[in-house]
Amino acid sequence: MVMDDYYFHDQKPELWAKINSLHLSYLEMEESPQKLDHKIKLDDCIKKFLCIAPHNQKFCFKETAEVLHRSASNKKDFSGYRAALGWNAIGMYAGNLISQPWRQEYRQIKMYSGFYKHEIEANLVGAEIMFEAMGYKHVGNGILVLEGPVCPDTVKYVSQDSLVAYVECQV
């Protein structure tokens, strides 16, 4: 009976809470060897979570699952490695927006820029919806603009989803 309780104990909520905590502290850390060690712990926790979570419970935003599915299904030369690069770029952008919301360069995304074309669009299909989830709006001519204050919680969850998708692409 005790063994049954152990095997059927749902670890997802505990792992998700640990991922939230590790991710938040990771975002607050300065670049250092300790931050790299912390990232390894965070990645390991995400891997454990991904092994037990059904696909519809892996992400905070449905958009994350949509971009991942669309990319794997529709990209002729899809590779998990390259998709991971795209997710990493989105996660880094979100992290920069959280840590430096006053910087004007994070308020506008030119979807024709080298960063967007080579890091995101080349590796993921329809990833602009991740930026829309952060509050960016299309203003025409391939430009996304973030007006008004940054919602740190929303951007944090986009960053976290990007990291979970990054690890998912590596598994």
Language model: regions and residue ranges:
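Ubiquitin-system adaptor modules
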Residues: 1-171
